[in-house]
Amino acid sequence: VKRAIFLGESLKWPTDGQEIPLKVRQIFTGPNIPRPQVALAPHLARQLLLDRPNGSTLACTLDGETQRFALDRLHHHLLPLRSQNVRDGAILIVENRTGEVLAYGSDSGEPASGRFVDGVQAKRQAGSALKPFLYALAFDERILTPASQLDDSPLDVAVFGGLYHPRNYESQFQGLVPVRVALASSLNVPAVRALSLVGTEAFLNRLRHLGIKALDESADFYGPALALGSADVSLWELVNAYRTLANGGEWSELRLTFEKTPLSPRKKVFSPQAAFMISDILSDREARSITFGLENPLATRFWAAAKTGTSKDMRDNWCIGYSPKYTVGVWVGNFSGEPMWNVSGISGAAPVWVEVMNWLPRNGAPARREPPPRLVREKIIFSHGSVSPREEWFIQGTESVLLEDKGGSYHQRILYPPPGTVFALDPDIPRDLQKIFFTMQTPQKAVRWVLNGSELPSLGKATPWTPKAGKYHLALMDGEGQTLDSVHFEVRGASVDPPQEEGEALVQGE
């Protein structure tokens, strides 16, 4: 009051010593008293009230306790990631049956700019988070089963303007792997091979049916990289797509308000059988152990299916998953688009996801899902012996109890280098520090490397070799001198030694 009177007098405004205290009292004791508080869902409020008159009141589906817990856990896990150039994140929690949104929010380390960015609706590259929908389509089209074998070895795909070289996150290859392992462990090369079987156009159309709206380019534009999530999606779209799997393959709109409108009709995107098999794979700790280990942030105290994703250059990482009752999605990255420093979905988004998911069923853990009709479970045997016999789910009519390796000694194949590879020596790096690793699939018997006719010291699946300029023939041979596999490759670049010609003896091992 004193400040207001002083300001009025200094500006020579007519002031009433009685009127100003009265007005101040009305402001701070009336029904519109300004209360210092943190808005729980500012982005959602802005979205819902955008086209409504001032003073509107609208009841939304958010659960206050769930919203507070989700935002608190998101903020808590983002703090230690600041040292790895991670500032922002978003979380979305929905109820599967009704589609009601229970938590919706973002957290930003840059409040001045982050408050204007809705992390739930922002478009980001999906990374590996799209793979479950690719394999679900392959199951429905009877192209693949969870037991089908896919080749995880170096692959060069011709695309417009050159070659596309998909690589796994760990830059290692596993050879022949079942689809179950390929999806659960998020192997990239098998996903690209699966896309070539399904067709990019068919996969693109299925993603559109899942409500992913930014896919307005042609199949040729996305190419084989679509299998690895080159498309832009929002957390909102991705969570609802995973909710579709939780609901047996049926998609419907998410619900933000309790207005007198019926639940949106459901449309069938995948069969219940395909949705169940994908869910079973995404909840399989053993199948994901190749990449993530048996104990990892995706392991919940009850049945839940989950998938991570990391976009190119580590600009975005995701963890999306569901129990029979809830679907939870977490995005971690930077609203500015800057890359993170060595942060993947398993280390960035997954810890938030698993803590929230474990907290949600606080009134009792959900029961495991029951298989739908027309699914059968058969014991399968892999003839090449690299995978132990196990039981697997099949859609009736697709089962096969013996999966043969038609390539004979295919499991002995050289994984790296691929045939015809041309390596370039780097003149700025000392030659003895440059290495090429010869790798093979896990052998079933004693094998040896032979380079240009001379045996190399073998160090197991991967043998390092110091390259020099020349042309080479690399063979993988058994103890009886039979060639199991061979490749030709070339090394180019500055070298103090004369170029090596194919056929000359050269032994270099580390």
Predicted regions and their residues:
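A short, well-structured edge-of-sheet supersecondary motif
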Residues: 20-24, 84-113, 205-210
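Active-site SXXK
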Residues: 1-9, 70, 99, 120-152, ...
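Non-catalytic, structured segments within soluble enzyme domains
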Residues: 1-68, 72, 205-220, 224-229, ...
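A penicillin-recognizing enzyme superfamily signal
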Residues: 60-83, 91, 95, 104, ...
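Conserved catalytic neighborhood of penicillin-recognizing serine enzymes
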Residues: 4, 10, 33-50, 97, ...
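A structural microfeature
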Residues: 102-103, 148, 457, 485
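Soluble, non-transmembrane domains of envelope/secretory-pathway proteins that act on or interact
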Residues: 24-40, 154, 158, 304-510
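Second-shell loop/turn segments in exported
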Residues: 2-14, 31-35, 54-61, 80-81, ...
